[in-house]
Every structure is written in structure tokens, then in C-alpha cells.
Amino acid sequence: MDFETSPTTGGATTSSRPTDTALSTRGIRVSYGHVQALRGADFDCRAGEVTALIGDNGAGKSTLVKVLSGALAPDDGEVFVGGEPFHAHQPTDAQAAGIETVWQDLALAPDMGPVANMFLGRETRRKGLLGALGFLDDKSMAAAAQREFAQLGVTADPRRRSVSDMSGGQRQGVAVARAVSWARTVVLLDEPTAALGVVQTKGVLDMVKRVADRGLAVVLISHNMSDVLAVADRIEVLRLGQRVASYTRAEASLEQLVSTMTGGTATPESDSTNSAGGTQ
């Protein structure tokens, strides 16, 4: 991996700036009062790859997603997007940097249809009289939604009037399609298969692979180790707010991941990373 040296915040003098990744974190720290939620969760995610973040409850996964999505500013450390420092104060800052998030609750408007949800707040308009007073271009938005659904394998009908009567897998598909249609660099997926059945889960995992195949970096947060091993190119293990190990899919087994998550083992890679100050 290529690195540059650059100034950091929080009193540190230098940090490693990754130059060959879509998304990276260095020295991220977040505290809630006396509780340290993150204390050095360093990881890298490359374009066209799925990077899974796993860990037991309290490992810091949710807090890290909030930092990456712009919903929470870290107390210290840096986030890099395309090798450049990224400072977000709100989710729209992350969206401006090409980062889109699919939250576990999907954040869909239940009384609106798939197309309206995909373009909510970003509606396409036709020019009105003298270039003003434009009208919503429903036809072009519906066509764009249909193309996105077809490319990702989403089975939902974009003509439906409401997403509330769709299956869980279909709603998940709408949320993923919305994120992919606007993302330029990274898609964050927070527990995308939670509460889904076997068939729906397979459909969502197939979508995750297609998103990465389009050249986007995908960060997958999941408790389901089978899902992680099915789609992840790299697996980062968090424990007590730190990245403690990193595996490729070929290196990892279910038993090894569970043992590392719970403190049973450490890998030579994680040991060398820690001794170099990467996750302290």
C-alpha cells in the first residue's frame, strides 16, 4: 500500500495518508462521556471491493458507520476519501463526497413509491416557462429507477404507489438502488440482511456483489458471518473500539472470525499492525 505523510488533528504531528484506497480511516477516536466507543479503528476499502466490518456488540461498528456517513464527528483521527482528507459535519457532506449509506431501518418514506423514494430531495425537473417554474419529470425518474432495478436485480415494481406493502427484500432493494444511483465512491451497508428470509438474503447479497462490480467501494457491516464470508473481499475485525485483525476471504474461516471477535486469537497481521501503531 502507498502512503504519504501529512499533518493530523488532535495534537498529532503526522499520519499515514493512503493514496490507493477509496475510503480509509486513521486513528479514529470517539467517546461518549467516559466510554470510549472507538479508539483507533483503522481500515482501508478499495474501489470494486467489499470490505466487511464485523465485531460483537459494543465493538464500535455503529459508531464508525455514523462517522463515515457524516452523522457523527470524531473526537480525533482522520477519514480519507480517495486519499484526500474528508471532514464531515453532517450527512450531506458525506453525500457531496460520493458516500451513500443504507441504514438498517432503510430510511424510506413508507407512503411513497419506489421512484419517489429514490429521488426524494433530488427530484429531476423539466424546465418550465422561460426556464422557470419547472415540473417534476416523472417519466425520466421512472425510467432511471427501472434501469437501476434491472442492473441490480431488484424485483420491486417501480410503479408501485407505496413501499409499505412491499416485502422486506424489495424494500431493501429500493434502498440499495437509491444509494447506488447517487454514490460516486462508497456505499455503506448497515446490516442489510437483518430480519430477511433465506431467499431475500440471497437476493440482497447478489446485489452487494453487483454494486462492487460497478467499481464502487462497499463497506458491509454485519453480524452474520455466513453473509460476510459469501461476499466480502476483506474482513476487518473490531473489538472494544479497535481494529484488531484483518483477513482476506481466503484466509478467514467462521471459527477464526468468531474467535478473533471474542478475543480468543490474534493474527500475525494484526500483531504487526498494532506494534507499528496502526490501531493503538
Could you tell me what each predicted segment is?
Residues 2-280:
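Glycine-rich phosphate-binding loops of nucleotide-dependent enzymes
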